[in-house]
Amino acid sequence: MAWTLVLLVLLGTSSCLDAKELHKKIDISALLESGSGSGEEGSSGSGSAPEPVRDQDVDWKQFKIKPEQCLDKGENCTGDPEQCQENWQEMVVQCPFSCRFCSQRSIDDVTECTDARGAACKDWADNRNDCLRFPQFMSTECTKSCKLCGKETNGKKFDKDVRCIEWAKNGYCNEGELYKEKCPHNCEVHKSIKKEPKGPYPYPTESLYPYQYWQLYPAPGPAPYPPYPYPTAAPYPYQYSPYPYTPYPPPPYPNPYPQPPYPPPPPPYPNPYPQPPYPPPPAPCSGPGPCPYPGPPPPPYPAPTPYPPPPPPYPEQVPPPPPPPPPPPPPPPYPYPYPYPDESENTKHKSKKHAKHHEKHHKENHSKKS
């Protein structure tokens, strides 16, 4: 483990090493090849084999390359993320940015209201919400896109928390000086907003580190079941005898719905038409003489009233009425006994007769006057 101690000592000497200097000072391959022993190929020898490099033996916090020097030089840096641990001595030179070997700047070191990552910052801030997901990186590399500064304050005031814009919009800047110290830019922009009564901001305003990942917050587990007051046996199908392969015999399965006892049979149905009692037999003769033979015949037994016939299941169908007889044929046209004369001839006859009568009457009047 001597080479491991050497590695830790070299890593601890500088908190901010350049990638090339780090690669020069730490030559893991030389350490792996180091060792004592003698012998040729095929012959036996003595010595100790090199121990493999383990991930937990490397202090990853010491890889703090300056942001301006932390750039990927390889072509396929994002292809296999496991190479950052398995082949880290090469990846720290070729892919320091993809392997997150860069040191993080502080918000206090920011002096210009710009985006150090260029046009990508706007996409990260607006579409991916990275200002809240990665606050340390976004607050220093995308200060303008996260709205930690702006032209409202001439780019001279910088907020120290990416949540400042939400605090200012909900009126927290008017609640105390602490918010004004952390958020000088947004408190100046939203100074006219008063705090709402209920405070709709969902995030905690005070915590040790406001952006702890969910793994760091211990999630409450499910509530434990209350203890039973007494030990309860397993359900019946799993209650086996302590003897092997001899389960308890199952009890008789009760009927889930017990049936009531059957009712007693009904008494015999009485005859709806009781029969009269039979006449008593004739009394024996009391006299000394022989009894007359044959005895008087018994009175005729009245016949029982016949049962009414059962009603038919369906009413009898009435036969349809016969069709009406066909109407008699119309009589032939009856001829008139005296056909009327033609009206035109009758009119002519009457006009001639009237003219003769008028002429005769005129002549008689004329003769009387003369």
Curated annotation (Swiss-Prot):
Residues 349-370 have a biased composition (Basic residues). Residues 70-102, 113-149, 155-190 form the ShKT domain. It is found in: Nematocyst; Secreted. Residues 1-19 form the signal peptide. Residues 36-45 have a biased composition (Gly residues). PROSITE patterns: SHKT. Residues 34-55, 306-370 are annotated as: Disordered. InterPro entries: ShKT_dom. Nematocytes. In late planulae, transcripts are found throughout the ectoderm in nematocytes, with high concentration of expressing cells in the oral pole. In primary polyps, is expressed in nematocytes in the body wall and physa ectoderm and in the upper and lower pharynx. This is Nematocyst expressed protein 4. It comes from Nematostella vectensis.
